[in-house]
Each structure stands twice: as C-alpha cells, then as structure tokens.
C-alpha cells in the first residue's frame, strides 16, 4: 500500500530533517510504500524554491543508505542516441543523449543523472527503469538482468 509523504513532512527550508527521514524507513519496514514528490517549498522571507523528487532521493540516500535506489522513468533508461533509442546499460563515463524539456522546472533528465551520480559515489547502485513496466523495477530490486541503466555504486571515488 502506498503512503504519501509531502516533502514538507521531512524538509525544513532547503535542509532535510534527519529524524523525519529516518521515519520514512520505519514506514517502509511496516509494509507501506513511501511515495514522495517534488514541490515548491517555502524558504523564508517570502521566498520559495523548487525541490525536485531527484534531490529528495539524494537526501534520503545520504541519511538512510539503502541497498539501492530506483528512479522510475517514462523511458527505458538513458540512451547513447535518442533517434535509435540505443540504451546505455551501465553508465561508465559516456555522455548520454538527453533531450531537454523546457517545461520541467526540476531539472529534467540532466538533474536525474546528476543526483544518481552523487548517490552512486556514496556507494549505492542506482537504477533508471521504465516505471510503466513494473516487472523491470522488480528485476532491479532482485538484482536480476533488467532493461534499464545502472549507475554502479563506487566508494571513495
């Protein structure tokens, strides 16, 4: 069962609230599936900012250090070529081909790649999979061959 968590539940300004992030782990261990999302948040003195779901993933990964992180996309993963949709199965320094969506104020695919790279540098594997094909998420979680892109976790790189 999904359990919706607005970012205001675990963010104060632009900083994560560690104690509240740790509660997300308790929610997950209880059998519920924590679901959060990016949003416009209050920053004080009549200022707001956009917090992307991708940035939230980095905050959660840094505090909870999960075994892996999965970004569910509307695509199969990252492509080396957008026209042929040639999938990059493991990102190893090559530059993926990314089309920019000017309507995406959260940073789009470029932000996803940046945040996934940060998480991988913390030592966790990160998977980009097509969220419209849930069996791919299951395969990634079970460490089976899956269709998508892997950012291999690297410690102290």
Tell what function each PLM region has:
Residues 1-157:
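C-terminal catalytic "cap/lid" subdomain
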